Amino acid sequence: MVGKIAPIAVDAMGGDHAPGAIVQGAVNAARKGLPVVLVGPEARVREELARHRAASSLPLEVHPATEVVEMHDHPGQAMRRKKDNSIRVCFELVASGRAAGMVSAGNSGAVMAGAILVLGRPEGVERPAIVSVLPALKGAPLMLDMGAVVDCRPIHLVQFALMGEVYSRRVHGVARPRVAILSNGEEDTKGTDLTRAAAAALRRAPIDFVGYCEGRDLLTGEVDVIVTDGFTGNVALKTMEGTAKVVGEYLKRALRSTTVSKIGGLLSKAALEGMKKRIDWREVGGAPLVGVNGVGFISHGRSDALAVENAIRRAGDAARTHFIDEIARAVAPSHALLEVPADGAAAEQGPTPRRTAPRQT
């Protein structure tokens, strides 16, 4: 996407490979014209920057933060007691307008706590959510929540759907996102009290709600926004990550098993590399937060330079759309949607039937 924005603030001390991989990713992004401000202990960050040739000529600056949130720190306490920590300072730069967004591969709970504490929430938003972009067969479907709210109420799922629809439309450019709730079946009788209440409300929402989707639908790309509670979403995401890793290992072993398979592997190298890139979590870079007054991305703790660079790029893309301006308007009717009519008809009808072609068997 085009258009100049303020720098993206990057937590230089977050993640297993900080500050080396974080600084490398920031340098790579800056070399592609993306303005970046690295936040962390100034001497240490500048020492790492000195390893990179001509870094001083890049759109890259350093902003000091004297404290670091460790992975074992309690998120809320760390935000309040370590007031000059790199995560909080990143959010302060966003809140002041000196940064267009922030990226951190550090303590995800601390990132969420910092976002709420420093940025606050748009009017009407009950709880923010973490969004994941799935490596589907087509499109770039979103799933939320991925762990911010593990014990959800119907209002949370309804607002996740409305916020996810805005993000899909404004940031990913989907003209009319198809929204579904993750469940254990497509039938009206499936799901839980939580999902049925949320589905009944979303039937009345001004979005393209298509009802329930199942776990097998996550990577097909048939829907654009998949809504679930944070516990289920986090388990689903890590299951997909683990499955991709195991399938990749099976494939490598199979291609090395015989001379013929090795030749076949060489002939298929380009296709295999394309597939590998498609499912590589580093290509996504990070998970955006929705429901806070600013752009924030949580990157994987194992992020390397490629993941950090992509997270910076995606944060910049999100900031350019100003999608946050629409969040408050989107969630405004959420409580009214949950008000069941006197005859109870909406609640009894359950989710809207899926508007997709019948599955071939």
Curated annotation (Swiss-Prot):
Reaction equation(s) it catalyzes: a fatty acyl-[ACP] + phosphate = an acyl phosphate + holo-[ACP]
Pfam families named among the record's database cross-references: FA_synthesis
Region of interest (Disordered), residue spans: 342-361
Gene3D superfamilies referenced in this protein's UniProt entry, alphabetically: Isopropylmalate Dehydrogenase (3.40.718.10)
Signal sequence, start to end: none
Record note on quaternary structure: Homodimer. Probably interacts with PlsY.
Stated name of the protein: Phosphate acyltransferase
Organism: Anaeromyxobacter sp. (strain K)
Gene designation: plsX
